[in-house]
């Protein structure tokens, strides 16, 4: 059985750990609030430009535009957004599980140290690695978007996918992999077919013409999609870290309480034993 001194030392150590995790929880909570606001505020613009692409797609020959044209090959480029630091619960491990299910010839662009280390360790082809700043802006996304578009237009890859953690709420973040290029996939084609009548009934005017507008909008669309993904990845990271640190603090506090009860029980038992020894000795002396 552990001695009183050992238990007391453990209580102190665990209490100090709880203080550290609580401080990290508060820091993560402050960052989480800002990141969540940025991710939420970016969604309306992302939806608007997405709707614009859909509207134009109903007025043009989709196969004539390289960023819309579909390919039957299996060469893929995956843009993988992870975190630079750990202590974010199961966030990165969920991403790694999604990644392991990928098949075919795959290249990777990574943003986040955890992801780049995993790719290198797995022996996969790493095309480029980018830092993911604490407060990302759209400038961070430009080189990522450029490489993705260039690789696709040069036909070095047949599809471009993004793997990231989609932000839903503080308690829910989901590892998601979805197609970025070509922009029109099978699912969107079905949706466009059902929306065609609505678009025809609602006349749209594109100046100077739909093709010219599309040429200008498509690169901006890719850039904004990547930027929105970065914002959601950051919101997910800070949310997961805040929850993980909160759980760690609560677990440490519970363990410290249990050890305190054990400490008090052993101490009380020792005191009772001493009293009994003194009483026994006193009776023996009478």
Go through each PLM region and give its residues.
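C-terminal beta-strand-loop-alpha-helix "lid" module of Rossmann-like NAD(P)-dependent dehydrogenases
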Residues: 1-286
């Amino acid at each position: 059985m552990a001695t009183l001194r050992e238990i007391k030392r453990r209580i102190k150590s665990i209490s100090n750990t709880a203080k550290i995790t609580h401080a990290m929880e508060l820091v993560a909570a402050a960052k989480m609030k800002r990141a969540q606001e940025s991710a939420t505020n970016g969604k309306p613009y992302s939806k608007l430009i997405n709707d614009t692409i859909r509207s134009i797609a109903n007025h043009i020959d989709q196969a004539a535009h390289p960023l819309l044209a579909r390919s039957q090959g299996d060469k893929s480029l995956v843009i993988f957004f992870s975190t630079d630091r750990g202590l974010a619960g199961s966030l990165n491990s969920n991403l790694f599980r999604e990644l392991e299910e990928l098949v075919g010839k795959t290249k990777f662009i990574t943003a986040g140290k955890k992801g780049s280390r995993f790719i290198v360790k797995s022996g996969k082809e790493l095309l480029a690695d980018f830092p993911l700043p604490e407060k990302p802006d759209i400038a961070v996304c430009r080189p990522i978007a450029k490489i993705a578009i260039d690789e696709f237009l040069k036909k070095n890859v047949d599809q471009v996918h993004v793997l990231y953690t989609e932000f839903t709420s503080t308690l829910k973040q989901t590892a998601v992999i979805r197609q970025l290029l070509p922009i029109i996939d099978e699912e969107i084609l079905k949706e466009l077919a059902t929306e065609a009548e609505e678009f025809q009934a609602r006349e749209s005017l594109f100046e100077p013409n739909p093709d010219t507008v599309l040429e200008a909008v498509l690169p901006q669309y890719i850039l904004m999609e990547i930027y929105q993904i970065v914002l959601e990845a950051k919101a997910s990271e800070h949310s997961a870290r805040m929850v993980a640190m909160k759980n760690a603090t609560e677990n440490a506090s519970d363990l410290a309480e249990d050890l305190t009860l054990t400490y008090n029980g052993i101490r009380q038992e020792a005191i009772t034993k001493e009293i009994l020894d003194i009483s026994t000795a006193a009776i023996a002396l009478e």
